[in-house]
Amino acid sequence: MTHQTHAYHMVNPSPWPLTGALSALLMTSGLIMWFHFNSTILLMLGLTTNMLTMYQWWRDIIRESTFQGHHTPTVQKGLRYGMILFIISEVLFFTGFFWAFYHSSLAPTPELGGCWPPTGIHPLNPLEVPLLNTSVLLASGVSITWAHHSLMEGNRNHMLQALFITIALGVYFTLLQASEYYEAPFTISDGVYGSTFFVATGFHGLHVIIGSTFLIVCFFRQLKFHFTSSHHFGFEAAAWYWHFVDVVWLFLYVSIYWWGS
């Protein structure tokens, strides 16, 4: 390894940003093909490419941070700023969906019957599955905080238990959301109500799946003793992301499920 006189990590050229971008293109194109032509070939190709990219990119980052020691305190500080900016960009992303929802619901057009929910739409009961989903995500927020505190105290077993509980709650939330979609009395094509409901809650569901994947990687890394009480930014970033997903759901629940019904 060459000697360097600074604390920054000079990253080697990597193909994964390109393959990740191509997999995103294949997945979005595949979704359109699935919706309009009932063909899942392109979607499956995109998902496979995405999974391979994730595996190999994570492998490289783990190698650079844990085994080669490139993630110095200075690099970790930069990564923290990067994660904060990423979460801010996600906040703005969801702001667009809330804007669309409130724009449509606060002044419903005569075409919708001048009321919200629009005439003919039977909204979901906010005190049934949505309320259960809310309690599941709030419980997962408690368990991820327990995992973080256990890691800071060097209690490995408690950290693994709490992380496993968080992942299980995340998977349970996803299954509940899928069953709710399956049984919903309206579809994404049912006007502006269906569009705003499924796009906002669907993107949140996608973020829960991403967060769960992030936490599963952290779980396997912890099994291999990758984290210490002073060096665990991978887990910290996952915890921040999970709390963000939690807060977004609270806004979705209050706005779309409770007030919007």
UniProtKB/Swiss-Prot annotation:
Protein encoded by which gene: MT-CO3
Mitochondrial matrix side, ranges: 1-15, 67-72, 153-155, 224-232
Record-annotated membrane-spanning stretches: 16-34, 41-66, 73-105, 129-152, 156-183, 191-223, 233-256
InterPro entries (alphabetical): Cyt_c/ubiquinol_Oxase_su3 (IPR024791), Cyt_c_oxase_su3_dom (IPR033945), Cyt_c_oxidase-like_su3 (IPR000298), Cyt_c_oxidase_su3-like_sf (IPR035973), Cyt_c_oxidase_su3_a-hlx (IPR013833)
Record's keyword annotation contains Transmembrane helix: yes
GO molecular function: cytochrome-c oxidase activity
Reaction equation(s) it catalyzes: 4 Fe(II)-[cytochrome c] + O2 + 8 H(+)(in) = 4 Fe(III)-[cytochrome c] + 2 H2O + 4 H(+)(out)
Family in the record: Belongs to the cytochrome c oxidase subunit 3 family.
Mitochondrial intermembrane compartment segments: 35-40, 106-128, 184-190, 257-261
E.C. no: 7.1.1.9
Pfam families: COX3 (PF00510)
Role of this protein: Component of the cytochrome c oxidase, the last enzyme in the mitochondrial electron transport chain which drives oxidative phosphorylation. The respiratory chain contains 3 multisubunit complexes succinate dehydrogenase (complex II, CII), ubiquinol-cytochrome c oxidoreductase (cytochrome b-c1 complex, complex III, CIII) and cytochrome c oxidase (complex IV, CIV), that cooperate to transfer electrons derived from NADH and succinate to molecular oxygen, creating an electrochemical gradient over the inner membrane that drives transmembrane transport and the ATP synthase.
Protein topology in the membrane: Multi-pass membrane protein
First-level EC class: translocase
Keywords: Membrane, Mitochondrion, Mitochondrion inner membrane, Translocase, Transmembrane, Transmembrane helix
Name the UniProt record assigns to this protein: Cytochrome c oxidase subunit 3
Coiled-coil residue windows: none
GO biological process: mitochondrial electron transport, cytochrome c to oxygen; respiratory chain complex IV assembly
Places the protein is found: Mitochondrion inner membrane
Subunit relationships: Component of the cytochrome c oxidase (complex IV, CIV), a multisubunit enzyme composed of 14 subunits. The complex is composed of a catalytic core of 3 subunits MT-CO1, MT-CO2 and MT-CO3, encoded in the mitochondrial DNA, and 11 supernumerary subunits COX4I, COX5A, COX5B, COX6A, COX6B, COX6C, COX7A, COX7B, COX7C, COX8 and NDUFA4, which are encoded in the nuclear genome.
